[in-house]
């Protein structure tokens, strides 16, 4: 078991050095992504505003509260916390997320299935497990 300090963007060589039970500390931007976001991206063809190449995404269910729209919160929502959500329901998006957007790491809880493991192996990515309930 080893520990890795990684800074985004991450390259394929860095990811392929990781082994099961290694620990990772990430530095840089982490993008939260949930099932609804990926449905918009892959089923409805919506483009992202961000370049995800070489970055990590976290399977998340953000918690927000409604506020008056303003400069700090133009959408009318303020973030409260970001909690992990179960990765299994996002299984079908792993390969397209890596192929089309260059994502290297997916962080989530509950794990992913064989199709995702094959995608990680084929495309140079990894799944990082996180403890559920860390947003509480």
Predicted regions and their residues:
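Short, structured beta-strand/loop micro-motifs enriched in basic residues and often containing a Trp
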Residues: 1-10
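Feature captures the catalytic cores and cofactor-binding loops of soluble hydro-lyases/lyases
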Residues: 32-136
């Amino acid at each position: 078991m080893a520990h890795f300090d990684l800074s985004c963007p991450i390259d394929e060589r860095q990811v392929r050095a990781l082994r099961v039970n290694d620990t990772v500390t990430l530095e840089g931007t982490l993008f939260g992504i949930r099932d609804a976001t990926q449905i918009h991206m892959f089923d409805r063809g919506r483009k992202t505003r961000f370049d995800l190449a070489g970055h990590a995404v976290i399977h998340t269910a953000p918690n927000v509260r409604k506020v008056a729209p303003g400069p700090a919160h133009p959408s009318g929502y303020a973030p409260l916390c970001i909690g992990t959500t179960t990765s299994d329901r996002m299984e079908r998006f792993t390969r397209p997320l890596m192929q089309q957007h260059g994502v290297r790491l997916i962080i989530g809880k509950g794990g992913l299935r064989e199709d995702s493991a094959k995608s990680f192996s084929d495309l140079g990515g990894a799944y990082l497990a996180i403890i559920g309930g860390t947003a509480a």
